[in-house]
UniProtKB/Swiss-Prot annotation:
UniProt protein name: Small ribosomal subunit protein uS2
GO BP terms: translation
Family: Belongs to the universal ribosomal protein uS2 family.
Amino-acid biosynthesis as UniProt keyword: no
One Pfam family this sequence matches: Ribosomal_S2
GO cellular component: cytosolic small ribosomal subunit
Alphabetical keyword list: Ribonucleoprotein, Ribosomal protein
Molecular function per GO: structural constituent of ribosome
Gene3D superfamilies assigned: Glucose-6-phosphate isomerase like protein, domain 1, Helix hairpin bin
Amino acid sequence: MALPEFTMRQLLEAGVHFGHQSHRWNPKMAEYIFGARNNIHIIDLAQTVPLMHRALQAISDTVAKGGRVLFVGTKRQAQDAVADAAKRSAQYFVNSRWLGGTLTNWKTISGSIKRLRHLDDVLNSGDASAYTKKERLTLQRERDKLDRSLGGIKDMGGLPDLIFVIDTNKEDIAIQEAQRLGIPVAAIVDTNCDPKGITYLVPGNDDAGRAISLYCDLIARAVIDGISRAQGESGIDIGASSRPPREDLPAAQATGFQGLSGPRGTPDDLKKLAGVSGDIEKKFNDLGIFHYWQLAELNADTAHQIGEEVGLPGRVDGWVAQAKGLTAEAE
């Protein structure tokens, strides 16, 4: 993999160069404005291109080191693109209302996420029949409300290492929280926005649907590049590895997952998965997980259970994705 490539023509076709009406501008964006046409500011794409590349590199580097990226875009035209890009790259997103304290009061947000999980369990299990129709509707409404705000971060497991923002004016609270915690911010900054405090500023139109889709696609591909780099830098000799046999009797675990009683041959070095420490590897081993293929075969529910067991539910999807890649290449 490599950083996603893009051209100035793509930016032009997506309308990235169109700013706001000249009387609505923020003077702090003057250096990124090429000029005005029909009272509309035109963004200097000669600056957008290298600044976008810089942001993509930073995002790829963050993920390659095991970091998490949070996509933030709550305006109507950004909601679908933000959610799709985050899901495609196994990251996290907020595309509805930003709840104040999402970053700075993570403990309280975690409590709300636990409530969301509880409601999911109740409504998706046989226990729901114990409630009246009215009670089930009340629980469903509460669940839907929480899911709109927290569904994209319920598996994050902790604070993100970088946030990517569409429309810095609308998401100013999210940016302020990130700045307060020292979390880097990559953002699309239009001509009516204040660039102050944005770590990786990308001048561009933050309203056009095609432009937003292009930004999100590039960021998602940069994340995937980071995941690929993390695998490549692990030093695993894939050509010398082979898929181990699985005929030994497994040991039952509290999670419902059946692990192995011991490694089949030489165990894989799970620490080479991005973000897995020695302590996490030991927890995997205690659960009977010694090989990449075991992680690769986890379904979504079991993966979440395993993530809860090792204390990092928000990271397990990335590990499963990496393990699938390694297993497929080994075959």
